[in-house]
């Protein structure tokens, strides 16, 4: 079962508060996980060893999901190069395979979002804290819509990742939208009730610049999350204890969130589409909980 199997309509968010709604939905899942996995109630004190083990586990889960999503992108890259970037004569079977890999990209990105939001909830970083940090750390950036924090952070993260990537000029030229190619060929035969188009948008615009930028952006997420982990000094084997520098710890987690939103921006997602794939995967997880999967 995956997000495509969920037929429940995605809630319409009219005020732009997608991030707040994601926090709400994630807390509903956590409340179940507290009972199933015997997790502590949120928020937690980050200093005890048990808390730090849990935090490091969550950061590892985020990184694992991102790696799985990137693995699908590597497969798309191989198929695209094999088929001359989908120009001229190309294999329709390979195009269908690429579309299936695109769907998995969205699934894994939604999973990464779940784990990072769960981590932020546990360490008591709220949406308003992220907005406050953005305002203080990016004072030269004009915020267009304070209510839509995801879109704001996507804009900032995406711009920073694009600016920081050294891409050759010739790599900026040719891109191909794999989803559009697929729909032009197979669109008339698709059952719209079983083809959730929003699950195929992430990474559908293929090009060297986009994929190289995404790979670099992934490292930025991993870097900030691992630097945050490094502030957690109370290893299970240590007999002495150290207080956590919580300001610097939380700063790195928020920077990791900004970089993750930059990744999603590079993939062509916006706040509405990200919420769509998050919600569908949220419902998959809720089904698994209720069915004792």
Which residue stretches match the model-derived regions?
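Flexible "arm" and connector segments at domain edges
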Residues: 2-293
């Amino acid at each position: 079962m995956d997000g495509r199997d969920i037929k429940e309509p995605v809630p319409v968010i009219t005020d732009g508060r997608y991030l707040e709604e994601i926090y709400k939905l994630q807390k509903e899942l956590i409340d179940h996980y507290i009972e199933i996995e015997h997790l502590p109630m949120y928020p937690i004190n980050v200093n005890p060893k048990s808390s730090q083990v849990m935090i490091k586990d969550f950061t590892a889960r985020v990184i694992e999901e991102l790696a799985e999503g990137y693995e699908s992108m590597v497969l798309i890259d191989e198929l695209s190069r094999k088929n001359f970037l989908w120009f001229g004569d190309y294999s329709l079977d390979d195009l269908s395979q690429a579309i299936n890999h695109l769907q998995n990209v969205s699934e894994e990105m939604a999973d990464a979002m779940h784990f990072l939001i769960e981590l932020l909830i546990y360490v008591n970083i709220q949406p308003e804290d992220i907005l406050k940090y953005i305002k203080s750390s990016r004072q030269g950036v004009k915020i267009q819509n304070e209510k839509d924090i995801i879109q704001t952070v996507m804009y900032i993260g995406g711009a920073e990742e694009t600016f920081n990537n050294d891409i050759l000029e010739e790599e900026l030229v040719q891109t191909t939208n794999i989803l559009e190619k697929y729909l032009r060929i197979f669109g008339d035969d698709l059952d719209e009730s079983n083809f959730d188009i929003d699950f195929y948008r992430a990474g559908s615009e293929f090009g060297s610049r986009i994929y190289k930028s995404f790979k670099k952006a992934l490292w930025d997420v991993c870097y900030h999350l691992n630097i945050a982990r490094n502030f957690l000094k109370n290893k299970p084997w240590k007999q002495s204890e150290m207080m956590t520098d919580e300001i610097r710890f939380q700063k790195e987690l928020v920077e990791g969130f900004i970089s993750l939103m930059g990744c999603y921006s590079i993939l062509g997602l916006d706040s509405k589409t990200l919420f769509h794939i998050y919600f569908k995967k949220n419902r998959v997880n809720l089904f698994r909980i209720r069915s004792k999967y």
